[in-house]
Amino acid sequence: MPNIPTISLNDGRPFAEPGLGTYNLRGDEGVAAMVAAIDSGYRLLDTAVNYENESEVGRAVRASSVDRDELIVASKIPGRQHGRAEAVDSIRGSLDRLGLDVIDLQLIHWPNPSVGRWLDTWRGMIDAREAGLVRSIGVSNFTEPMLKTLIDETGVTPAVNQVELHPYFPQAALRAFHDEHGIRTESWSPLARRSELLTEQLLQELAVVYGVTPTQVVLRWHVQLGSTPIPKSADPDRQRENADVFGFALTADQVDAISGLERGRLWDGDPDTHEEM
């Protein structure tokens, strides 16, 4: 079993890396896949209202042999539930579906700027934290100006910003802002959706050098950037492969070379324009 380390967020709460992305893990098979991941050492399970599998995540937590206090369950508020009161109601709904007393990390899924209620939603999440419904609060797909607004208007800095991040889109400027403000970067689609990324010659060569797979090279790159990747997989062998990235270290030049593969987003997911309700 890989030894998956924990870190501390800016609110002092523990956080684990890597996490398990649970998108499309549904039904009994989804629950079994999540339990297998927990048994393999994963401690962070990432879900969302829009994934329509919060109940399965809760079932997996209860079915696992790991104490609830050792697990970190994260969920996300969808655009259709933005607003201060609406955010609290959304979180209560997630808790009901999860069958849990508290959510460890609550995120805003997308800012949905045309709706213009992400700041009020953030205030609602602060309310939920003060009410003991959630432990840590953060955001997903927020830009630097949006983060500045949250901090300036409320005095509360997000613990996490989960964003698209992979060697084709390393987000150096945003990561630097995160580091400056103590915001943990979390990477969705960390393997670029297993596009041609894993066939890149550089990654193939580094895999040979370290006796690992190209997937492990990429996930190790995330770790050394200071970002928590959340790859998704229902296959227990692949889950173990994805978690087993702490037995080697890339050089600084190798990290920079991987970042040099940059080409842009996988799709038109610009937070300034993208809407997801």
Swiss-Prot record:
It is an enzyme of class 1 (oxidoreductase). The keyword Oxidoreductase applies. Substrate binds at H109. PANTHER family: 2,5-DIKETO-D-GLUCONIC ACID REDUCTASE, NADP-DEPENDENT OXIDOREDUCTASE DOMAIN-CONTAINING PROTEIN. The gene is dkgB. Catalyzes the reduction of 2,5-diketo-D-gluconic acid (25DKG) to 2-keto-L-gulonic acid (2KLG). 25DKGR-B has higher catalytic efficiency than 25DKGR-A. The active site is at Y51. GO terms for biological process: L-ascorbic acid biosynthetic process. The keyword Endoplasmic reticulum does not apply. One of its GO terms (molecular function) is aldo-keto reductase (NADPH) activity. InterPro entries: AKR (IPR020471), Aldo/ket_reductase_CS (IPR018170), NADP_OxRdtase_dom (IPR023210), NADP_OxRdtase_dom_sf (IPR036812). This is 2,5-diketo-D-gluconic acid reductase B. PROSITE patterns: ALDOKETO_REDUCTASE_1, ALDOKETO_REDUCTASE_2, ALDOKETO_REDUCTASE_3. 2-keto-L-gulonic acid is a key intermediate in the production of L-ascorbic acid (vitamin C). Gene3D superfamilies: NADP-dependent oxidoreductase domain. Keywords: Ascorbate biosynthesis, Cytoplasm, NADP, Oxidoreductase. GO terms for cellular component: cytoplasm.
